[in-house]
């Protein structure tokens, strides 16, 4: 049986292959990284096959969110605020629709909360 790291890598590769097909339409992708304490999200525009440009980024380390953080651990409430902050920053740059790149993470918990927060102002 495969261990959790192998399953994560398989899931990540499967998600990235699906996104590669969708982002060929010119949509930027909303990429998510989660650590034990923080969650990070960024809107990335792919330029060619090997280059990419970060349009907007937000995390629980941003001053707007970090001052409200009661615990040094990300939860659903703060993940939703990160999604909302990222959506505002992307809208200010003229981005209205993105492709959600969850990486190898399951669409559950803080990943779902971040997506719901971003979905309030972005289309995906």
From Swiss-Prot:
Family that this chain belongs to: Belongs to the universal ribosomal protein uL18 family.
Example GO BP: translation
Organism per entry: Orientia tsutsugamushi (strain Ikeda)
NCBIfam families associated with the record: L18_bact (TIGR00060)
Subunit structure: Part of the 50S ribosomal subunit; part of the 5S rRNA/L5/L18/L25 subcomplex. Contacts the 5S and 23S rRNAs.
Annotated function: This is one of the proteins that bind and probably mediate the attachment of the 5S RNA into the large ribosomal subunit, where it forms part of the central protuberance.
Designated name of the protein: Large ribosomal subunit protein uL18
Upper classification of the organism: Bacteria, Pseudomonadati, Pseudomonadota, Alphaproteobacteria, Rickettsiales
Keywords from the UniProt entry: Ribonucleoprotein, Ribosomal protein, RNA-binding, rRNA-binding
